[in-house]
């Protein structure tokens, strides 16, 4: 597995070794031992999630607070998405910075997003299926998020018009509101 560093040290792009011929392809999408070797510490995933979304759907930017924070290993298994991780660790040198990556069924890349990051994605293809592993269970009372168009973060989305958001995602906080409300620490 090839590891590609991003502008934020702790966020990694993982690129599998793909074996292909006229029959199709094969690749190992996850190997616990290899993954922990890359990170340098043990990780225990407890939940796998799978979503299907239409073009222009924007999901996020989500995170869970406190003891329910989650590390995530994400990938797009059908179609393509623009995937984003935002550093919300107040003491981090990259606090408020973001990383954006094209994840697709074609490139088969995965993005490692550690605790302390908000995460979201924009569907670029007609349909996208998105799968991710988490190190903590979903906990509705700890669910939180940052609005996709927060001017302080200034994510350079591939498009900003015609987006489809859930009512919940339309009401998310700005980073400054999260700080003022003490929802990140």
Swiss-Prot record:
Substrate binds at residues 23, 28, 47-49, 59, 72, 119, 143, 168. The keyword RNA-binding does not apply. GO terms for biological process: DNA damage response; dTDP-rhamnose biosynthetic process; lipopolysaccharide biosynthetic process; O antigen biosynthetic process; polysaccharide biosynthetic process; response to antibiotic; response to UV. The record marks 138 as: Participates in a stacking interaction with the thymidine ring of dTDP-4-oxo-6-deoxyglucose. Gene3D superfamilies: Jelly Rolls (2.60.120.10). One of its GO terms (cellular component) is cytosol. Keywords: Carbohydrate metabolism, Isomerase, Lipopolysaccharide biosynthesis. One of its GO terms (molecular function) is dTDP-4-dehydrorhamnose 3,5-epimerase activity. Catalyzes the epimerization of the C3' and C5'positions of dTDP-6-deoxy-D-xylo-4-hexulose, forming dTDP-6-deoxy-L-lyxo-4-hexulose. PANTHER family: DTDP-6-DEOXY-D-GLUCOSE-3,5 EPIMERASE, THYMIDINE DIPHOSPHO-4-KETO-RHAMNOSE 3,5-EPIMERASE. This is dTDP-4-dehydrorhamnose 3,5-epimerase. It comes from Escherichia coli (strain K12). The gene is rfbC.
């Amino acid at each position: 597995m090839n590891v590609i560093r991003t502008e934020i040290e702790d966020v990694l792009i993982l690129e599998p070794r793909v074996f292909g011929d006229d029959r199709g392809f094969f690749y190992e999408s996850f190997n616990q031992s290899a993954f922990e070797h890359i990170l340098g510490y043990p990780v225990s995933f407890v939940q796998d999630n799978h979503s299907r979304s239409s073009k222009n759907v924007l999901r996020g930017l989500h995170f869970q607070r406190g003891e329910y924070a989650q590390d995530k290993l994400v990938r797009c298994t059908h179609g393509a998405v623009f995937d984003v991780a935002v550093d919300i660790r107040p003491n981090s040198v990259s606090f408020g910075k973001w990383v954006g990556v094209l994840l697709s069924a074609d490139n088969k890349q995965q993005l490692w997003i550690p605790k302390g990051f908000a995460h979201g994605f924009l569907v670029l293809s007609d349909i996208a299926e998105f799968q991710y592993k988490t190190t903590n269970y979903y906990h509705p009372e700890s669910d939180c998020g940052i609005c996709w168009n927060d001017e302080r973060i200034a994510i350079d989305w591939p498009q900003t018009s015609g987006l489809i958001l859930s009512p919940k995602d339309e009401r998310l906080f700005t980073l400054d509101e999260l700080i003022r409300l003490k929802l990140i620490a």
